[in-house]
Design a protein with these regions (language model features):
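Alpha-helical transmembrane segments of multi-pass integral membrane proteins
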Residues: 91-104, 166-177, 212-221, 249-273, ...
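Intrinsically disordered, low-complexity terminal tails and inter-domain linkers enriched
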Residues: 1-81
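Membrane-interfacial, low-structure loops and terminal tails that flank and connect transmembrane helices
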Residues: 61, 66-84, 232-252, 389
C-alpha cells in the first residue's frame, strides 16, 4: 500500500533496557551492549516508540511502525479532493432511480411494466433476480465510499478487486453501447418501430432510459475513482518491463483464451455487420444497427480478453500497463455479460426458454470460458508481480 509520509513527534519512553526518544522522525535506541539508529520511518502515521536491542530490534521496529501507519491512515480524516467527492456523489445519486424501481417492484408495484409483460406475474425467478440486482447496485455505493475514504485503503485486495471487476464487466458494454444507440436513434438509424415495440412489451421505454442512463453515470464515476486509487495502491504492478514468461499452464490458458476470443470476435463481428445466420428467425427479424453495436462491443471485448492474456503470459521488455488495463476490461466484460446472457436465456419464465438458438447459447458459454481463462492469466500475472494485499 502506498501513502504519504506524515511526521509526528512521539513522547520519550524509558524502559529497563534503554531510552527511546523521537523528536524529528529519528528513533534512537540505546542498549548496554549495542546502539541502533533507525531513521527509516515507514507509513504515514509516524514511528512507534519501542525498546529495541540489536539488529533484530530495529527490524521489529520497522514492522511495528508500518502497522501503526496503516491504522493511523485508516483513522485519518477524509482528505479526498473536490473532484473525487463530486464523482462519489454522482455515483451514489445515479443508483437511486434503479434502487427505487427495484424496491417498488419487490413491493408489488407495476410501475414501468406494460400490460401483457411477463413481469406482471414475476414468479420466484424474477423476484430473486430483482433482489440480487438491487443488492448489486447498492454495492456501488459501498464501492464509491471504499475508493474515497481512508478506511478503504486497508480493505484486502480480493474484497475490492472482485466487485470492481464485476462492475467493470457489467458497466463497460453499457458505457460503449448506450450512447452509441442514442446517437443512432438521433440520426434516424435506430431500430425500426416493430423492433422497438417488441422491447417495450417487456418494460416501458422510459425505464430503459432511466436505468441505462444511471448505469452510464455510475460507470463514468467509478472509473474516475478507481483509476487513481489503483495507481496509488498497486502502481508497482505495471511499472517496468513485463518480465519473464509465465509458467507453462498459464501460457496454455492464455492460448486457449486467445483462440476462443478470436472465434467469438469473428462470430460477433459477423452479426454486427448484418449477418443473421445462427440468430434464429425472431432475432433476425429484430436485427438493426442498435443490435449491431452490441455485437460489435462483444466482439472487441472477447478479442481484448484473449490476446491481452497472451501478451501478459509471454512477458518481455514492454511495459504491461496497456495489456493489463485492456485485458482487465475485456475479460471482465466478456465473462460478466456472457454469464448474464446465459442465465437470462436459460431461466424459466423469461420468454427465452428453449427458443434460444444453440449457436447463441454456445456463444454465451464461450464468453464465460474466455473471460474466466483471461481473468486467471491476469491473476497469475499480478500474483507474480506481488500485488500488495
Amino acid at each position: 500500500m502506498t501513502g504519504r509520509t506524515m511526521h509526528e513527534t512521539d513522547p520519550t519512553d524509558t524502559t529497563d533496557t534503554g531510552r527511546v526518544t523521537d523528536t524529528t522522525d529519528t528513533v534512537r535506541v540505546t542498549d548496554t551492549t549495542d546502539t541502533v539508529r533507525a531513521a527509516d520511518v515507514i507509513g504515514t502515521a509516524g514511528a512507534t516508540s519501542e525498546t529495541l536491542s540489536g539488529t533484530e530490534g530495529a527490524t521489529a521496529g520497522k514492522a511495528a511502525s508500518g502497522t501503526a501507519a496503516m491504522r493511523g491512515e485508516a483513522r485519518a480524516p477524509d482528505a479526498t479532493g473536490a473532484g473525487a467527492r463530486v464523482l462519489r456523489a454522482a455515483a451514489v445519486a445515479a443508483t437511486l432511480p434503479y434502487l427505487a424501481l427495484k424496491t417498488a417492484w419487490l413491493a408489488g408495484s407495476d410501475i414501468g411494466i406494460p400490460e401483457g409483460s411477463v413481469l406482471l406475474d414475476p414468479g420466484v425467478f424474477f423476484t430473486v433476480a430483482n433482489a440480487v440486482t438491487m443488492a448489486m447496485d447498492a454495492a456501488v455505493i459501498v464501492l464509491a465510499l471504499l475508493l474515497t475514504r481512508p478506511w478503504g485503503r486497508r480493505v484486502p485486495a480480493p474484497l475490492l478487486l472482485v466487485p470492481a471487476f464485476t462492475a467493470t464487466g457489467l458497466l463497460t458494454p453499457i458505457l460503449a453501447c448506450f450512447p452509441a444507440q442514442l446517437a443512432l436513434r438521433a440520426v434516424g438509424l435506430g431500430a425500426d418501430p416493430a423492433a422497438r415495440a417488441a422491447g417495450e412489451s417487456f418494460l416501458d421505454g422510459w425505464v430503459y432510459l432511466v436505468v441505462y442512463g444511471g448505469f452510464t453515470v455510475q460507470g463514468l464515476a467509478l472509473t474516475g475513482l478507481f483509476v487513481p486509487y489503483a495507481r496509488r495502491r498497486w502502481g508497482s504492478v505495471w511499472q517496468g518491463a513485463s518480465g519473464v514468461r509465465l509458467p507453462s499452464p498459464t501460457g496454455v490458458a492464455a492460448g486457449a483464451a486467445a483462440a476462443l476470443g478470436t472465434a467469438l470476435g469473428v462470430l460477433y463481428a459477423y452479426w454486427a455487420f448484418g449477418g443473421t445466420a445462427g440468430l434464429g428467425a425472431e432475432r433476425a427479424a429484430l436485427h438493426s444497427a442498435e443490435t449491431g453495436v452490441v455485437s460489435a462491443v462483444h466482439a472487441v471485448c472477447a478479442l481484448l480478453a484473449g490476446w491481452c492474456a497472451v501478451l501478459l503470459a509471454r512477458g518481455g521488455a514492454r511495459r504491461p500497463v496497456r495489456p493489463l488495463v485492456a485485458g482487465w476490461t475485456g475479460s471482465a466484460a466478456t465473462l460478466c455479460w456472457g454469464l448474464y446472457l446465459l442465465v437470462a436465456a436459460l431461466a424459466p419464465g423469461t420468454g427465452e426458454g428453449g427458443n434460444t438458438p444453440a449457436v447463441i447459447l454456445l456463444a454465451y458459454a464461450g464468453q464465460v470460458v474466455t473471460g474466466c481463462l483471461a481473468a486467471a492469466v491476469l491473476t497469475a500475472f499480478a500474483t507474480r508481480r506481488r500485488i500488495p494485499a
